[in-house]
Amino acid sequence: MNKSESLYAAAQQLIPGGVNSPVRAFNGVGGTPLFIERADGAYLYDADEQAYIDYVGSWGPMVLGHNHPAIRDAVIAAAERGLSFGAPTEMEVQMARLVTSLVPSMDMVRMVNSGTEATMSAIRLARGYTGRDKIIKFEGCYHGHADCLLVKAGSGALTLGQPNSPGVPADFARHTLTCVYNDLSSVRAAFEQYPDEIAAIIVEPVAGNMNCVPPLPDFLPGLRALCDEFGALFIIDEVMTGFRVALAGAQSHYGVVPDLTCLGKIIGGGMPVGAFGGKREVMQALAPTGPVYQAGTLSGNPIAMAAGFACLTEVAKPGVHEKLTALTNQLAEGLLAAAKAENIPLVVNQAGGMFGLFFTDAESVTCYQDVMKCDVERFKLFFHMMLEEGVYLAPSAFEAGFMSLAHTPQDIDRTIEAAQLCFSRL
């Protein structure tokens, strides 16, 4: 038994499933999860000191790579001044100024502690601002584990939502409508059925929780137009895509302006941070200036703000996103060529610094139904083969991969070589 196996056995006696977030348990691929000892640059080192090229990046935040000196130094300096005050700090003002300067659709921003808090709060704000109860989300999109968002479609796209987790009351779920990602007709039908009841649409601009599915050209502009037509707010969940697909987020890359934006992951530089913001008129409905309540003991934590400010300062430097996209292109093109050489049907989707692998005979993957037709069993085999070759992919066929600025062309060449070897064995 290696150390990861020993630690996992102990963890299962103390922590539900042995992990503090379900996907880490490797249930999607089988086997024992890696317990990580340390990380540096593009590499993870497990408890047995095995090194892996990392394409998970802590599920997105580590866009600069692990243990980046600017972030590390900022955290150390902030910690020397105190860990938490429960009072406003200058760094909160600086962070808010930086975020709103980078994302033009955000006139004001409120800091929270996670992406789930950001989406949950944005939806509450949208409901309070509009005086409406229903929201629209999309099949295959994940916006955190708030009750109103753990909802699946019913027998049809317009069926009132049904909970997909025990513990979520049906009365909560019925206010959530689930439509088809990249299908505007399903969204229009929902609005026409409930024209005065829908407070907001919430959408991942690139669906990163059914692997990686970018929007079709007319999808996001079409959602914006429908919200305007029916008086609903347009919420873009950039927890995963923010500062990764483009500096101002996927919304700038795809040319749409939301009413509210949710942020997380990169905004904290590896620390637990979320944020939501948008139009001044809407944001001023939040307490203490307005009636919509939202609060948090650790919101705006000085350590987290220091890490986030350092990270965004680096990310905002010229050429960063061009480099990130070029590295992702190199990986995607290399994987496709390697798969073709071994007669393995593969689709690779990408958007900026994120990507997704789909074992499928289809020419493209554009929606949840396409994703569900992919060969999950083949992915499981591929995942473990790549792990043996020292490459750490997301341990699920339904999670996106992430590039960092710490990856080198040589790291990517090594990854492609490993993939071709694994493809030859599938």
Curated annotation (Swiss-Prot):
E.C. code: 5.4.3.8
CDD domains with a match to the protein in the record: OAT_like
Co-factor(s): pyridoxal 5'-phosphate
PANTHER family reported in the protein's UniProt record: GLUTAMATE-1-SEMIALDEHYDE 2,1-AMINOMUTASE, GLUTAMATE-1-SEMIALDEHYDE 2,1-AMINOMUTASE 1, CHLOROPLASTIC-RELATED
Family note: Belongs to the class-III pyridoxal-phosphate-dependent aminotransferase family. HemL subfamily.
GO cellular component, one term: cytoplasm
Highest taxon of the lineage: Bacteria
Subunit structure: Homodimer.
Pathway named in the protein's UniProt entry: Porphyrin-containing compound metabolism; protoporphyrin-IX biosynthesis; 5-aminolevulinate from L-glutamyl-tRNA(Glu): step 2/2
Stated name of the protein: Glutamate-1-semialdehyde 2,1-aminomutase
Organism: Pectobacterium carotovorum subsp. carotovorum (strain PC1)
UniProt keywords, alphabetically: Cytoplasm, Isomerase, Porphyrin biosynthesis, Pyridoxal phosphate
Single GO biological process annotation from the record: protoporphyrinogen IX biosynthetic process
The keyword Endoplasmic reticulum belongs to this UniProt entry's keyword annotation: no
Modified residues (N6-(pyridoxal phosphate)lysine): 265
Reactions accelerated catalytically: (S)-4-amino-5-oxopentanoate = 5-aminolevulinate
